[in-house]
Amino acid sequence: MTEYASSLLRLLSERGYIHQMTDADALDALAAKQVIPGYIGFDPTAPSLHVGSMVQIMLLRRLQQAGHKPIVLMGGGTGKIGDPSFKDEARKLMTNDVIAANVASIKTVFERFLTFGDGPTDAVMVDNADWLDRLEYIPFLREVGQHFSVNRMLSFDSVKQRLDREQSLSFLEFNYMILQAYDFRELSQRHACRLQMGGSDQWGNIVNGIELTRRMDGVEVFGVTTPLLTTADGSKMGKTAAGAVWLNEDALPAWDFWQYWRNTDDRDVGKFLRLFTDLPLDEIARLEALEGSEINAAKVVLANEVTRLVRGEEAAKAAEATAAATFAGGGLGQDLPTLSVGESEIGIVDALVGLGFAASRGEAKRLVAGGGARVDGEPVTDEGFRILVNDKEIRVSSGKKKHGILRKA
């Protein structure tokens, strides 16, 4: 492992955040001698970010922990176009009202990760709509457009991939990388920003911003990207068969959020503890070394630590208590998904769909046929099975890790 002089790059390296850097030696030297403002952009494509964005949010947290200044850039302007990087087709355009509502909803998450204020290392949040919405087309083309080579833009993997597949890339989308580059230059002027960070898919956009800032202002700025994060089975972070694992409390119950982390593959436990918690590295090494059924204790620690960070102490405690009641004591935790039944009975298929364990009746039937459905711990293999609902709560399970409650309405 490379030895760095700055606490910032040492921290990022030790915890596995670094994929690529521009001029690592110069960035290391700068970070060792002064406070660096650094930013990451988040486009408001939904009312909540999901777990797939957590590496970037944690990267801003690490920046602040190392004594530097995080800048959260909300893409109120670029969100009107949509980032085409490595997408097979154009994003659906959102109205201005939807974008504004999404920005307002997303903002609250960052307060759990970062300290905001007016101090030299306090985080700030800005919106690129503040400058992009004011651009005039002809002056922008003359001042900024001259610094971009279309030939080079076509060579970036994110663009080349679409063209090689003969998939349409609109002029609107093609302009996204220019606007993102302009963001870096604008933040350099407004906030003395010297660093842009992002996922590995943003490398081309980051390099464009570095070059634009150098050409227009003669300022040296830097870029860092994180590795593409997938689970051990090759799945993308933040998505499950049931949908996205949202960060906002109103988008996903704390129990489901906690359970996502508790279900982590054994092979991912150490990596996720380093990336998504503040636990000391020696403690992570101890947890990562656990084998057999003991690794489950490390998964509970992971679930508790991440849920505490994202949802708060009480949510983490409640989720763990629900898990203990459900799995250890055979009881029913209070935070499990619940379905109120108005009739005296309900079919197993309808119960599975109603509890969110299957997206459709067909999927529920396949789950039953495959032996994945249980009622109060007993397997159900008949898709026509009816569950009698009385004053007693009934546990319905999908596989070993998903549990819900049926209650009389």
UniProtKB/Swiss-Prot annotation:
Keyword terms, alphabetized: Aminoacyl-tRNA synthetase, ATP-binding, Cytoplasm, Ligase, Nucleotide-binding, Protein biosynthesis, RNA-binding
Binding residue positions for ATP: K239
Chain residues that bind L-tyrosine: Y39, Y176, Q180
Alphabetized InterPro entries for the sequence: aa-tRNA-synth_Ic, Rossmann-like_a/b/a_fold, S4_RNA-bd, S4_RNA-bd_sf, Tyr-tRNA-ligase, Tyr-tRNA-ligase_bac-type, Tyr-tRNA-ligase_bac_1
Biological processes per GO annotation: tyrosyl-tRNA aminoacylation
S4 RNA-binding domain ranges (all copies): 346-409
CDD domains in the cross-refs: S4, TyrRS_core
Reaction catalysis annotation: tRNA(Tyr) + L-tyrosine + ATP = L-tyrosyl-tRNA(Tyr) + AMP + diphosphate + H(+)
Pfam families referenced in this protein's UniProt entry, alphabetically: S4 (PF01479), tRNA-synt_1b (PF00579)
EC number, as in UniProt: 6.1.1.1
Record localization: Cytoplasm
Cellular component per GO, a single term: cytosol
Motif ('KMSKS' region): 236-240
Domain of life, per lineage: Bacteria
Assembly and interaction partners: Homodimer.
HAMAP family: Tyr_tRNA_synth_type1
Function: Catalyzes the attachment of tyrosine to tRNA(Tyr) in a two-step reaction: tyrosine is first activated by ATP to form Tyr-AMP and then transferred to the acceptor end of tRNA(Tyr).
Protein's name in the database: Tyrosine--tRNA ligase
Species name: Novosphingobium aromaticivorans (strain ATCC 700278 / DSM 12444 / CCUG 56034 / CIP 105152 / NBRC 16084 / F199)
Gene name tied to this protein: tyrS
